[in-house]
């Protein structure tokens, strides 16, 4: 009974605070709300057990620990001390960088620092004592060095570590950086951009960023804590910004001179408009940025969608900025199997050895058959598949080989991106698959198949550079 009364008191205080916040916003929409609410209280004991994070959504927060002033941290991601990828992951990443370089594109990776590295002062004394900050810092910097050894331009964010700024880099209870964190990051990234070959030739203009009100955030960590423990948290308010060319408001030329930006940005929701990362990049670099970031698409969806687009192939950027967090797996083989052939636009404009258009029926559909026994060596060929309905975001297919071996491959696209229903991927090029001779391609119809769905599938030879790299990488 005592516990319940205490919780009701906290909720009442929170409700009163929110009412005061609403009144403040009504009086001045651009002002930060002023209210007083009691802290939400400590997390419940269940939050300490990984087994309680038993859904795909909750698994992202394994596991939450209480910090100061309603701050929450995740032990798995925020307090990690290991970074980077496997030896195979580094090889694949280097190969992708080389392919982009061959196309005249310099790759810049924005490898976000963790909350533990930047905001460890917010940890409770016990959690701070248990977090090996020096090891995390050492390994993060070693990973930055590995990116650079792979020929990838990679900013060093260590000047932001252990910050004691008035405006925090991260939100109290959310995995995103605040606009202030985005601004500090963009300033460092812009200094790296200025070192990239070809940057000097990119047209420049002056940009300015202005505060345009407030951004409210009821954080993802706080929402997860509410599911696990029933805790309630106050909404956090921070400054919101927008960036535009100097004089654009007066001239009406809000989008510049109409030229194509020569720097493209792909990445996560951290690069979305709410945090103005792209705008701050424009301000500090003086260059137009084409922002292709996707919210909810992981580290790869926006890059794959951009590489599938007509824009990428007709107007390739001189510099490609790829932003993602440290917890993403850079060794995902399925990602590189798609990204590598997309550099040259799959089978578009290339001679195909097999091609067919089929109206799908329920179940499995044989779409391509190597009936002439053509010498289609798996390690040297690419498949290019396009659904007639772009709303289909999953490809389930089986690739059969002459000796009876088969590969069942499932590729899922984020519903946050539009790739026109197109899927491009390399056939298997592992050492024990590369010499297999292709026999057929079967596609399983989507469960909720649109009426009259058709698929166009082609097989073509990979670019010589790709074929040689796949062999060299083994």
UniProtKB/Swiss-Prot annotation:
Keywords, ordered alphabetically: Acyltransferase, Alginate biosynthesis, Disulfide bond, Periplasm, Signal, Transferase
Gene Ontology MF annotations: acyltransferase activity
Disruption phenotype: Cells lacking this gene in the mucoid strain FRD1 are phenotypically non-mucoid, i.e. non-alginate producing, and secrete dialyzable oligouronic acids of various lengths that are mainly mannuronic acid dimers resulting from alginate lyase (AlgL) degradation of polymannuronic acid. Disruption of algX in the non-mucoid strain PAO1 does not visibly alter the phenotype of the parent.
EC number: 2.3.1.-
Disulfide bonds: 44-229, 347-460
Active site: 174, 176 (proton acceptor), 269 (nucleophile)
Leading EC class: transferase
Gene Ontology biological process: alginic acid biosynthetic process; single-species biofilm formation
Region described as CBM domain: 348-474
GO cellular component: periplasmic space
Stretches that traverse the bilayer: none
Pathway membership, UniProt: Glycan biosynthesis; alginate biosynthesis
Function: Plays two roles in the biosynthesis of the exopolysaccharide alginate: protects alginate from degradation as the polymer traverses the periplasm, and also plays a role in its O-acetylation. Acetylation of alginate causes the cells in the biofilm to adhere better to lung epithelium, form microcolonies, and resist the effects of the host immune system and/or antibiotics. Displays a low acetylesterase activity in vitro using a pseudosubstrate, 3-carboxyumbelliferyl acetate. Probably has acetyltransferase activity in vivo.
Entry's free-text remark on domains: Consists of two domains, with an N-terminal domain with structural homology to members of the SGNH (GDSL) hydrolase superfamily and a C-terminal carbohydrate-binding module (CBM) that may bind alginate.
Protein name in UniProt: Alginate biosynthesis protein AlgX
Species of origin: Pseudomonas aeruginosa (strain ATCC 15692 / DSM 22644 / CIP 104116 / JCM 14847 / LMG 12228 / 1C / PRS 101 / PAO1)
